């Protein structure tokens, strides 16, 4: 057993840890950059958020994975936006607590197929504040989504 653990440790030292980096070292810039760009990525979405008219039922699981656009654009005036979408089915257990019944059924969810960085439309106030040096250190409102990240 000790020989096996030593072999695994040596292999990780030679090839790197599964995350793509050697333990204790920083992730390389190109890997960080590639992971952060605007692209489709698997995300969890709440079934009730996607189907708000279904509040009379319970769902198992209560959320599902779908591809959605996410990531950073090169300019803060741009936002990662879905330019292609499709409907996908997921098998969900629908529970009716009043009747004490349940059944497996297919529910439809929107999945993103293509993403692009596009100009932000409409500014919504998020309540975040940013220092405005021109006003003697007073704070000014920052529109939603115009902060880093």
Swiss-Prot record:
Keywords: Disulfide bond, Growth factor, Pyrrolidone carboxylic acid, Secreted, Signal, Toxin. It is found in: Secreted. Transmembrane segments: none annotated. Expressed by the venom gland. GO terms for cellular component: extracellular space; membrane. Residues 118-149 are annotated as: Disordered. InterPro entries: Cystine-knot_cytokine, PD_growth_factor_CS, PDGF/VEGF_dom, PDGF/VEGF_growth_factor. GO terms for molecular function: chemoattractant activity; growth factor activity; toxin activity; vascular endothelial growth factor receptor binding. It holds the Pfam family PDGF. The modification Pyrrolidone carboxylic acid is found at residue 25. Snake venom VEGFs that may contribute to venom dispersion and prey subjugation by inducing vascular permeability and hypotension. This protein induces an increase in capillary permeability after intradermal injection, as well as a drastic hypotensive effect after intravenous injection. The hypotension is mediated by nitric oxide (NO), which is produced by VEGF-activated endothelium NO synthase. Also induces angiogenesis in vitro. Like other crotalid VEGFs, this protein interacts with VEGF receptor-1 (FLT1) with a high affinity, whereas it binds to VEGF receptor-2 (KDR) with a low affinity. Homodimer; disulfide-linked. Interacts with VEGF receptor-1 (FLT1) with a high affinity, whereas it binds to VEGF receptor-2 (KDR) with a low affinity. Does not bind VEGF receptor-3 (FLT4). Belongs to the PDGF/VEGF growth factor family. Snake venom VEGF subfamily. This is Snake venom vascular endothelial growth factor toxin 1. It comes from Sistrurus catenatus edwardsii (Desert massasauga). The lineage of its organism: Eukaryota, Metazoa, Chordata, Craniata, Vertebrata.
């Amino acid at each position: 057993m000790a020989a096996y653990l030593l072999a695994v440790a040596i292999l990780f030292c030679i090839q790197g840890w599964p995350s793509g980096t050697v333990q204790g070292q920083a992730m390389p810039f190109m890997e960080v950059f590639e992971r952060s760009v605007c692209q489709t990525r698997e995300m969890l979405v709440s079934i009730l958020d996607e189907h708000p008219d279904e509040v009379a039922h319970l769902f198992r699981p209560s959320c599902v994975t779908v591809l959605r656009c996410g990531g950073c654009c090169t300019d803060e005036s741009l936002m990662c936006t879905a330019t292609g979408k499709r409907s996908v089915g997921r098998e969900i257990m629908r529970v009716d607590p009043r009747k004490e019944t349940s059944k497996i059924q297919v529910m439809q969810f929107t999945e993103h197929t293509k993403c692009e960085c596009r100009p932000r439309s409409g500014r919504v106030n998020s309540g975040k504040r940013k220092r405005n040096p021109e006003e003697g250190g007073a704070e000014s409102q920052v529109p939603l989504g115009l902060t880093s990240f």
